Amino acid sequence: MAGGRDMNQATAIAMATPSLEDAQRSRLLFCLFCACTVAYVLMRHANSLLLDPDSWWQVKVGLDFLANRTFPTVDPYSYTFAGQPWIAKEWLGQVLLALAYDAGGWNGVVTLIIATIGLTVFLMGWFLSAWLKPVLAVVLAFVAAFLVAPIYTARPHVFTLPIIVIWTAMLFRAAQEERAPSPWLLALVVLWANLHATFTLSFVIGGLAGLYLLSRTGLSKPVLLAKWVAFGLLCPVVSLVHPYGVKAILATLTVAYGNEAVPLILEWRPFNAQEELVKEAVMLLALFGLLVSRLRIGWAKALFIVFTLHAYLSHQRFMYLFFLLVPLAIMAEVAQQYPALSAATWLAQKRDGLEKVLARHYYAISGAVAVLLIGAVSVLGSVQQIAPSPKTSASGALAFARDQRLSGNVLNSYNFGGTLIFHGIKTYIDGRTDQLFLDGFTKTDDATGHSDGKPLLEARLKKYAIGWALLAAGDTRIPFFEELGWKRAYADEYAVIYLPGA
């Protein structure tokens, strides 16, 4: 396909369209509207962003860093693995959460998360509308945002969503236009590496984009290929610009290969079609569309789709790789092979009434949106006080423990580890199982809740000199505590406290 045709269609049509500026303004406002709609929906369900028990300790790690200005190298938060090697590899994301918490409590944390998700949706719409009609682009962006909603939690991975969208869109665009990737993209790798451990995905996505270039040019442009190879080699190098250096990469590998906790954590479990009917329907519909349409994407992009689908089917947490990135990767082919859907066709048409209004009042609308956003944040902070779910906070139980001056080591349910860390109580187990609670510890802890787990539980109570137990109301070990003579000292809808019998 000729190089001119392969150019970004919005750029190609610019030379011939007098109303390009108005069209681009309309395009921008369409994307802004989509982002604001998603942000509004999230604000209406803000408490759902704080359902993850790990939000507690992620914020606490950031707060401790701001207070001490030191990067931890050993575990300071549990008694079972105290002093064992542990690094805050996602320190920058944790600091951002802590700064938001300092500024506005949990309301501030939620506001920051919603703003980041809104930015992600805006970028999705913007990159898609470079090739597709804006209305189609924002609909796709909105649908993608809805499908990946389960990953919207107050944790550092959310801060990487705008980065992975930019990274994927820019690299595949560079390959499409047969040019070298911009060096400034390497700065995104540095930022990504300090925000969250998924930065190693940048290496894979970059490699697949490079294969796409190779599928287009073959070996006919050796200088260009050399630039791509150099860029790819620099990605892991610049990721070492991190307080922990290569340890951050090694810590990522411990999760990916052989971590005993992975099968026990919901987000790491494989895709389950019986529980994800909507997502299954979307994937089957997409597969059906590829099979019956005339869309040709080439082997490199097919490999990219296979990679993202494999990651999602293997671990539910990677759903965003498929639903966010696949549209970005194949949008050029859709626009080229179905011109009626393309941005080029839209740009060549006369602007309709709505588009003219948007373009004519661009600055007024943008200003109004800014005022509304500021007002919404103010209302969110003053009217609705957001707090983590009682299912993870154990607020009543911890108040009882504080009033009764309970002391000694606590045996806690997994989901209460975060709130214990936040409140300065050393944990038995918590959500940092990517680096800690290994060597059989997590497996044994899980086994204590099985039907034959009472002897294992009794052994652990003695081994770790447990002074009290903080358990979720549905913890399967509760009958064992009663059989072992422990007394229920506190109970509510969400948590139970047991103390040793006389």
Report each predicted region and the residues it spans.
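Membrane-interface alpha helices of multi-pass inner-membrane proteins
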Residues: 41, 144-148, 182-197, 234-239, ...
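Transmembrane-helix motifs of polytopic, lipid-linked glycan transferases
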Residues: 111-131
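Membrane-interface transmembrane helices that cradle and orient dolichyl/undecaprenyl
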Residues: 167-182, 287-293
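Short periplasmic/luminal acceptor-recognition loop of GT-C membrane glycosyltransferases, typified by
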Residues: 402-440, 467-473, 498
